[in-house]
């Protein structure tokens, strides 16, 4: 209730009339009138909304207010197990029927149909469903069966045990193990201490089917469920269907009482320090626990104001911590704050400070970050800091508001899911925007915005005794000292007693470009492909643009040029390191005369960004903006060419950050595997080496910046592409000022082959690594040279999808060898035209050879018999659905014009005919006449040094 009282104080401060303001603050906020919401007699809640984007598609969710915290001791892991079983047989869809039914209308398992289980909730989704009457009926029946009609057959349960075990294995990371090992300390006296959703493998491997059924029938019931349907639908008809299909479901007799499980307050601080051999770097968290806003007040102005002030406060404080991290003598590479759930529980929140120390400076880093928190608490965040964070929040709201009539369905779905689970508001975009704008303006006029943010910071961080937790996750490596609990406690005491001075907010009050360049001009205008127009500028640059109304708040910009690393002069390892990393590092170094910190402050409240890259055979820019910030987009683009970052402090900090991230990387098996994959594929070419911590000693600011400038020295070498909602006259004006004005070399570089060659023949790289949790991992790459065409691209893509369907059945469902397995086929063009089939299979170590056999068998079966009509029809439906959706996506058209103008590849015209024309023989012939004719198969297998779990 403290947070409610605080919110009421803020409202009174802003609106003066205390009685009226306080009363209004706790009244329910208006519900979005566009959503049809109701509750059936059996208690099931429904949310239905018509929304036309994506066109002719609908989204179906069923939300359960139950998770692992509802399990008893003999059921640990069964909430998550039950989630899996929803895809393994229901009354109306036995066996694999749920997935098969969805895939028939182009909905892909894992991508469009999925689920998740947490401690407090379980949510199932079927996305991007073509909204025909038949498909809608099917999806509602699936939701019905998930709610009440699972078969839970013993043989299906038995097969799924192994899949769950492999998911546990795959997700067993260093941080996960540390958390698991210390939950009892972090949650004293709480049920959450023994309710991690993955559960205990001893229970997963041995529970009886009746135990699972008991959990299902006890907790999966209408009064704890909600059905959410959003899409291009008739909402009234959907509501009627929901009533028809779900009303007959009854709650169990003598139903179990549903309750939230509290996290008890702790009167003394909790310090936990643990280490793991695979923990890459130290991470220290200080958590100030606090009660969440009571559910009955979450749909109120009091809740929204509290959340808004918290967001502004954390944003401002994070900007300050980031600025501190740029100092060369700062002992941490990064620190930030957040307010959210306390670890895995929703019934306790926490304001959390997270610190990533530089190697060997764990305690000092924690103390310095904690001091900065105390500085903000003692002296307050400044009005200018708060204003920047507030302006940034307003600009984000404006972006959503301006595109309110073209929001895609997932935006609304998340609102309704959280409303059901957490009681949070579901106002219309208009009401939300007007409310936040009105409250913000009133708070600013009353002088209460800064005071409110600082008051909430003080409230959250009031005690380092009661409800205070410090958790340190550290590497377990010889030579790396791990801080003790007492050392961290002493660091907190030192920070609390430190004599601090107020923070000074240094702001560079000048424009990004102090003197506008002499503008150039457009010398030629011509029509291009796909509705684009092309301007040729006086300096030789080309600008392609297309106005769209797909997203009222979006302008996309790309710039592309041939060149890249293929034009670099490399005579040493250091040369190679610096040219490979040039764009990444220089991107951290500010822009123009602005340091990295100054640039962040200057751009606060502006929705515009531009990033540069240098690839193997090209370089370019990628940017986006809202229409009102189009000039800023051009200013940033101009500076990327004429005056890239020169902030050496930021450069050095980034070097230290990378060295810290990679300090213990050799102990992380996944990193060794990544390195082996790239080395095997490219014949151990040093140009694909994954760098380690010591390699960053080669980082040279001057060399990187010089290579960056050389790659971006001449706009005549570039094509610029603009797609979205902009005024053409403004675009023309800005193109002449900021692009045509850049001095040019007057010539275009041509494509040059970088000379990076994949290994040929049959290559098998198998190795072992010491692991804390034994894991197997397989990557197989099959590739070859092959002329590119839309037909070949569609064929190899379909081949990957067919193989995925078969591997899921043979390796996951029938073999229980893996949790995640799949194949991806793609055809590429550039300096080389190739196809590639990429198979990924994290696997049970003892089953690695069996999985490899089945991977090989899948390809041989296609070579012998092709694929079934059903397999191919699923793929066609999925691709055609995505193609239709892409017609109103800016990035799709931007990619088409780039492919056409740079490579003369038309990836659009005739696509539907190509997909519809795909046949089993196409796949069969491709495998026999292309893949097997000259087989290049590269297999990388990593296994544990010991199989002991």
Residue ranges of model-derived segments:
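Bacterial Sec-dependent N-terminal signal peptides
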Residues: 1-25
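Proteolytic maturation boundary segments
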Residues: 19-48, 234-308, 313-318, 322, ...
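M16 family metallopeptidases and their MPP-like homologs
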Residues: 49, 54-71, 77-79, 96-145, ...
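Active-site His/Glu-centered metal-binding helix of metallohydrolases
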Residues: 78-86, 313, 582
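Metal-associated gating/positioning segment near the N- to mid-region
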Residues: 85-93
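Peptidyl-prolyl cis-trans isomerase
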Residues: 101, 149-152, 156-157, 445-456, ...
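Hydrophobic, small-residue-rich alpha-helical packing segments that form membrane-like cores
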Residues: 161-169, 174-211, 215-222, 230, ...
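Internal metal/ion-chelating core segments
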Residues: 206-242, 698-731, 735-736
């Amino acid at each position: 209730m403290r947070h409610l009282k605080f919110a009421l104080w803020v409202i009174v401060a802003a609106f003066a009339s205390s009685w009226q303001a306080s009363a209004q603050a706790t009244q329910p906020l208006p519900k979005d009138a566009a959503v049809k919401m109701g509750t059936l007699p059996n208690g099931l809640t429904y949310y239905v909304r018509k929304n036309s984007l994506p066109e002719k598609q609908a989204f179906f969710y069923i939300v359960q207010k139950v998770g692992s915290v509802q399990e008893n001791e003999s059921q640990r892991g069964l909430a998550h197990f039950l989630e899996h079983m929803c895809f393994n047989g229901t009354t109306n869809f036995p066996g694999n029927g749920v997935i098969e039914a969805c895939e028939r209308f182009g909905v892909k398992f894992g991508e469009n149909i999925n689920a998740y289980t947490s401690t407090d909730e379980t949510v199932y989704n079927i996305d991007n469903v073509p909204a025909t009457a038949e498909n809608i009926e099917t999806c509602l029946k699936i939701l019905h069966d998930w709610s009440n009609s699972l078969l839970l057959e013993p043989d299906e349960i038995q097969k799924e045990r192994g899949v769950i075990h492999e998911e546990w294995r795959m997700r067993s990371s260093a941080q996960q193990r540390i958390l698991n090992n210390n939950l009892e300390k972090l949650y004293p006296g709480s049920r959450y201490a023994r309710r991690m959703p993955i559960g205990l493998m001893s229970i997963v491997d041995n529970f009886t089917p009746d135990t699972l059924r008991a959990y299902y029938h006890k907790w999966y019931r209408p009064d704890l469920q909600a059905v959410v349907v959003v899409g291009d639908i008739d909402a009234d008809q959907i509501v009627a269907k929901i009533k028809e299909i779900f009303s007959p479901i009854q709650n169990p007799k003598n139903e179990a009482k549903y309750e939230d499980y509290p996290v008890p307050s702790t009167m003394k601080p909790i310090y936990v320090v643990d280490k793991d051999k695979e923990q890459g770097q130290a991470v220290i968290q200080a958590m100030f626990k606090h009660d969440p806003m009571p559910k009955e007040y979450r749909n109120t102005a009091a809740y929204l104001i509290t959340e808004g002030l918290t967001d502004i406060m954390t944003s401002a404080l994070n900007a300050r911590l980031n600025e501190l991290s740029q100092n060369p003598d700062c002992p941490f590479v990064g620190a930030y704050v957040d307010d959210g759930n306390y670890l895995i529980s929703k019934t306790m929140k926490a304001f959390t400070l997270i610190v990533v120390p530089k190697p060997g400076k764990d305690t000092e880093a924690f103390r310095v970050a904690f001091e900065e928190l105390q500085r903000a608490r003692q002296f307050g965040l400044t009005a200018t800091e708060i204003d920047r964070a507030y302006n940034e929040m307003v600009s984000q709201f404006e972006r959503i508001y301006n595109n309110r009539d073209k929001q895609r369905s997932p935006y609304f779905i998340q609102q309704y899911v959280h409303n059901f689970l957490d009681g949070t508001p579901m106002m219309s975009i208009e009401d939300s925007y007007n409310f936040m704008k009105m409250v913000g303006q009133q708070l600013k006029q009353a002088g209460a915005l800064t005071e409110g943010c600082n008051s909430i910071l003080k409230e959250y961080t009031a005690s380092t005794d009661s409800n205070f937790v410090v958790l340190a996750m550290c590497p377990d490596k010889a030579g790396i000292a791990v801080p003790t609990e007492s050392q961290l406690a002493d660091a907190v005491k030192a920070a609390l007693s430190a004599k601090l001075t107020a923070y000074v907010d240094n702001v560079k009050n000048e424009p990004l470009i102090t003197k506008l360049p002499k503008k150039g001009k457009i010398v030629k205008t011509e029509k291009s492909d796909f509705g684009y127009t092309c301007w040729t500028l006086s300096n030789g640059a080309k600008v392609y643009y297309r106005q769209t109304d797909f997203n009222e708040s979006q302008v996309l910009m790309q710039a592309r040029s041939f060149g890249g690393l293929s034009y670099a002069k490399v005579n040493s390892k250091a040369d190679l390191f610096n040219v490979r990393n040039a764009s990444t590092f220089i991107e951290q170094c500010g822009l123009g005369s602005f340091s990295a910190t100054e640039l962040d402050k200057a751009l606060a409240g502006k929705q515009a960004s531009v990033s540069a890259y240098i690839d193997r055979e090209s370089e370019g820019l990628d940017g986006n903006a809202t229409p009102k910030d189009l000039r800023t987009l051009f200013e940033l683009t101009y500076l990327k060419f004429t005056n890239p970052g020169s902030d050496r402090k930021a450069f050095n900090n980034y070097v230290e950050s990378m060295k810290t991230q990679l300090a213990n990387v050799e102990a992380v098996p996944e990193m060794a595997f990544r390195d082996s994959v790239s080395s095997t594929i490219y014949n151990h070419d040093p140009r694909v080496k994954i760098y380690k911590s010591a390699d960053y000693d080669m980082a040279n600011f001057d060399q990187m910046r010089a290579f960056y400038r050389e790659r971006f020295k001449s706009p005549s070498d570039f094509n610029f592409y603009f797609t979205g909602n902009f005024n053409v006259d403004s675009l023309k004006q800005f193109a002449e000022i900021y692009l045509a004005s850049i001095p040019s070399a007057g010539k275009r570089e041509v494509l040059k082959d970088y000379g990076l060659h994949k290994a040929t023949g049959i290559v098998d790289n198998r190795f072992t690594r010491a692991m804390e949790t034994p894991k197997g991992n397989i990557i197989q790459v099959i590739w070859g040279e092959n002329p590119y065409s839309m037909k070949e691209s569609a064929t190899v893509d379909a081949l990957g999808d067919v193989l995925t369907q078969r591997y899921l059945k043979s390796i996951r469902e029938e073999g229980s060898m893996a949790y995640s397995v799949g194949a991806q086929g793609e055809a590429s063009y550039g300096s080389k035209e190739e196809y590639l089939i990429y198979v990924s299979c994290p696997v049970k170590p003892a089953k690695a050879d069996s999985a490899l056999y089945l991977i090989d068998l899948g390809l041989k079966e296609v070579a012998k018999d092709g694929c079934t009509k059903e397999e191919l029809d699923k793929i066609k439906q999925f691709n055609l659905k995505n193609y239709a959706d892409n017609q109103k996506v800016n990035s799709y058209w931007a990619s088409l014009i780039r492919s056409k103008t740079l490579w003369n590849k038309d990836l659009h015209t005739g696509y539907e005919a190509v997909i519809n024309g795909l046949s089993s023989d196409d796949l069969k012939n491709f495998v026999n006449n292309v893949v097997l004719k000259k087989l290049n198969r590269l297999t990388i297998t990593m296994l544990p040094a010991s199989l002991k779990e």
